[in-house]
UniProtKB/Swiss-Prot annotation:
Leading EC class: oxidoreductase
Gene: msrA
EC number(s) from the headed UniProt entry: 1.8.4.11
Record keyword Mitochondrion present: no
The protein's role, per its UniProt record: Has an important function as a repair enzyme for proteins that have been inactivated by oxidation. Catalyzes the reversible oxidation-reduction of methionine sulfoxide in proteins to methionine.
Pfam families: PMSR
Protein name (Swiss-Prot/TrEMBL): Peptide methionine sulfoxide reductase MsrA
Amino acid sequence: MERAIFAGGCFWCMVQPFEEQAGILSVRSGYTGGHVPNPSYEQVCSKTTGHTEAVEIIFDPSLISYSDLVELYWAQTDPTDAFGQFEDRGDNYRPVIYYTDERQREIAERSKQTLQASGRFDQPIVTSIKPAEPFYLAEDYHQGFYQKNPERYAQSSAIRHQFLEEHWQ
């Protein structure tokens, strides 16, 4: 099994696309990239901990590749916006691919270069690619949010879905 960590704005919106893929064992919402151990949601939202909301994905590489996960990640985000994603603004919503080893870094960097060269976007691709840092699980009520709160999830992800339809489909 392997692990992937992606930050792409609100973690509620990053779970379902990965959970729907064959070879995914778990997708958990949490926080990473900051300087406070085991932060709470309230602390992260205060924008004082340095963390970003992210998802940790455990996957079977014999069924789905890390490269496939990176491609799916791009299609869930606006890679030209370094200051948040869609209606979620601020450093705690910044887009980051966190790599766990050198192979993942190379795959992510190559994929980013390919996306930039594709001409899909007029603006530069600004998503960061950084080494993985400690990943802290978010509170239980954030886990599987789209399943527990489908109406609130649909409302919170509407702007994202509109962008994805316009740019990725």
